[in-house]
Structure formats: C-alpha cells, structure tokens
C-alpha cells in the first residue's frame, strides 16, 4: 500500500503524518519517525473500518506546499 506521508520538524523531534487517516508519529530522527509511523499505521489498519481503508487507498495528497504568510 502506498500512502502520502509528510515529515516535519517540531523542536527536537521529527513528526511523520498522513493527512488522510490522521495517523501521526514522532521520533528523534526522520528515520525513527517513519519507523514509528509505520507501526502506528499498522495498528490503525488493524482497527479501521473497510470504508476508512478504501479512503486511505484513494486519498493521495495532490501536493504538499510551504507557504510564506505575512500574518
């Protein structure tokens, strides 16, 4: 299964997240965050309803953008 995962840094931790399912995990390194994410996603998948799994398969993000907003 292929899904879109974003990784960003929050303080000293890396955060990996799937915006479609809401599954999120973190780690001290990018690799650790992704490893933890895979474990969290597998646990989510075991408990997810069929319609949630179908949405996850169809829900590839179109783009991830970095915006510089003046607020």
Predicted features, each with a name:
Residues 1-3, 35-71:
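Short, charged, surface-exposed hinge/linker loops at domain edges
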Residues 19-22, 62:
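A detector of low-complexity, intrinsically disordered, Ser/Thr/Gly/Pro/Ala-rich segments
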Residues 3-20:
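Short aromatic-glycine-(Arg/Gly/Cys) micro-motifs in beta-strand/loop hairpins
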Residues 21-31:
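A short, exposed loop/beta-hairpin motif centered on an aromatic-Gly-Thr core
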């Amino acid at each position: 299964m292929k899904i879109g995962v974003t990784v960003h840094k929050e303080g000293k931790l890396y955060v990996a997240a799937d915006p479609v399912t809401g599954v999120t995990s973190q780690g001290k390194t990018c690799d650790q965050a992704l490893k933890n994410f895979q474990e969290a996603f597998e646990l989510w998948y075991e408990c997810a309803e069929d319609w949630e799994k179908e949405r996850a398969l169809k829900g590839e993000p179109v783009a991830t953008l970095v915006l510089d907003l003046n607020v």
